[in-house]
């Protein structure tokens, strides 16, 4: 490709509304342009990267035995009503009616559609297992689209769905997808980790996320420092304290705390160790419960894990925090003064809270706290559960080492769905014994557009993007200095350009009448891994300058060797 025949829409300034580095660089490098909130046009440079990501995904899915299909973006509401997700999914599901007053949705995912297809196409266990995938546009009406294509409303996704008659067969395909995903992200040159994860709104049992490590990541991922344990913080078990609860040394006293409405204020004003405080959060109780609310208690320096809390039988799903009015109606005190003593609604405490003694908590009286609370003396020990986020330094749940926490960007997710959708949509085949058998399913997703942003978050410097070779928009940039004035520069540039293309290498030749500084800045901003600079001065010595974008290393290479050097060093 020649820049004179290409749309090279680079920007010098960073757009003010771009929050994260990937969004900033995708705009500056001319990869995307915003059309509306959460909607982006992909320009040629961005589309080249997107297609390379897509091709790697497609190759590895095909290698793993998956079969490509294409399903409609628009889906009839009846399928979502049949599965039960019409009510469950929430406002992210864009719903509309056509001119015939029939209800439809814009698909955020395709479990219902593929299950409907399979229940009508398959009849015997002999046709299974099968694994279908597509790479297709999805739409989720995000309440607050942000971070460019990292959290957009319209996005490209690879979604796959497998069907089985046994759990063993599902496990084999799940393992094959785990391996395929590992190959996909390795080929893309990404530093990633597969981690145990929650199944979320998709449903099912076993689940793994593939997380690209990056400081800007939205997820906290947890690792053991000595074993292979890795999990999303939502799922990581907080191991119960190993030391027994200390004996009481204080009497419980009622203390006036009119200006201490938060744990931080309580600690500061009364010089308390934060690990000796307890915070109480009230959430709505499950439907049909005797009480309207449930009190959840965690240590003052810990955070409630909402995913764990939502799984408690007495807690409403989705987890909903009580309003101040609801709290006052149930407890007769405000949110800043809540605690376990005389709490009139059911209480669940975290394991770490159960191990505390002589602790401080709200007195369920406005402006007052109890200090020196002890379990089984001042208040009976209530239900104990793991309801907090782990913190760095906690013991690893596998009993090996301690936990580290890093930020990650989720780019892939695999699920063992079981029979959630096949039960709801009555998808079955005739089993080996002649009886009807409900199908077992797996679901496997990759956020193709998200991968592009995640790769940039992990691969950039002060000058721009630093693409891994496999997904770079171009692998080689040719920068001929003053080619319009020098015949030999032009001749050699054209020759090298043709030879690289003949070798199947993606090459961009900058044939603009631009200053060298502009040419260098654009190529570094775009992030092309390999750059060759052809100039009269170096040609006097029969040499060409080569620069590797990732480490900035420059070297002089003989003109007769440059083609072989590039062919040997470009990773494909």
From Swiss-Prot:
Cellular localization per UniProt: Cytoplasm
GO CC field: cytosol
One Pfam match: tRNA-synt_2b
Matches recorded under CDD domains: ProRS-INS, ProRS_anticodon_short, ProRS_core_prok
EC number: 6.1.1.15
SUPFAM superfamilies in the cross-refs: Class II aaRS ABD-related, Class II aaRS and biotin synthetases, YbaK/ProRS associated domain
BP terms from Gene Ontology: prolyl-tRNA aminoacylation
Single GO term (MF): proline-tRNA ligase activity
Xref: InterPro entries: aa-tRNA-synt_IIb, aa-tRNA-synth_II, aa-tRNA-synth_II/BPL/LPL, Anticodon-bd, Anticodon-bd_dom_sf, Pro-tRNA-ligase_IIa, Pro-tRNA-synth_IIa_bac-type, Pro-tRNA-Synthase_IIa_type1
Coiled coil: none
Alphabetical list of PANTHER family matching this protein: MITOCHONDRIAL RIBOSOME PROTEIN L39/PROLYL-TRNA LIGASE FAMILY MEMBER, PROLINE--TRNA LIGASE
Quaternary data: Homodimer.
Protein name: Proline--tRNA ligase
